[in-house]
Amino acid sequence: MRLVPVILVALLAFSPSVLPAQAGAAVKQMAHARVKLAEQVAADSEIRRAVAAKNAERESRQAIERKDQEWASSPAYPLRKALTSSPCAQRLRQLTAADPLVVEAILMDEQGANVCVSRETSDYWQGDEDKWRRPFVEGRAAFVDEPAFDASSATYAVQLSVPVADGARRIGALTLTLKVRKDAAAPGR
């Protein structure tokens, strides 16, 4: 998914009395309040098994790039339906359904390729994006990106990413796209 930067997201999602810096901080706070949810999803045994199975395929970089090009150029590309209707995708939706701010979940393998997605994304390969690099390559426990317009969910959103691990070894990453909303609050509030 490609994000279009939004300079004045505060003007769109928050009251005019809130300064942009304060709004950005509030959005990031809302995302950080969902780190536990993201970690629970990433630790789910079905989710981890799906990532491990995808990694075992040892997909070549050329195959990933070819799939990424076909994914982006063809809305009818069969892999789109396969990755949104798989048991893994159904599990992603089930695990995130209770939080109305989660508009998308993306599960990625050790190369940044989609394992499964809760809804169609704008691209297949996330390996060139911070949502994969920060938790997988850099090993950040949680990464919250800047609020932006998300083309695949057609909403102003912030992305929260965490690693998927097998013991102490990172095997993939999970991103939750959270819609930015004036009344966004921590789960359970």
Predicted regions: what they are:
Residues 104-110:
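Short hydrophobic alpha-helical segments used for membrane anchoring or interfacial signaling
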Residues 25, 29-32, 79-103, 178-189:
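Solvent-exposed, extracytoplasmic
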Residues 114-118:
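Amphipathic coiled-coil signal-relay and dimerization helices
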Residues 20-77, 101:
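Juxtamembrane extracytoplasmic/periplasmic/luminal helical "stalk" adjacent to the first N-terminal
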Residues 102-104, 159-160:
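Short loop/turn microsegments at loop-to-beta-strand junctions
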Residues 155-188:
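Conserved beta-strands of PAS-like sensory domains
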Residues 77-92, 120-148:
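Extracytoplasmic/periplasmic sensor domains and loops in membrane signaling proteins
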Residues 5-15:
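Bacterial N-terminal signal peptides
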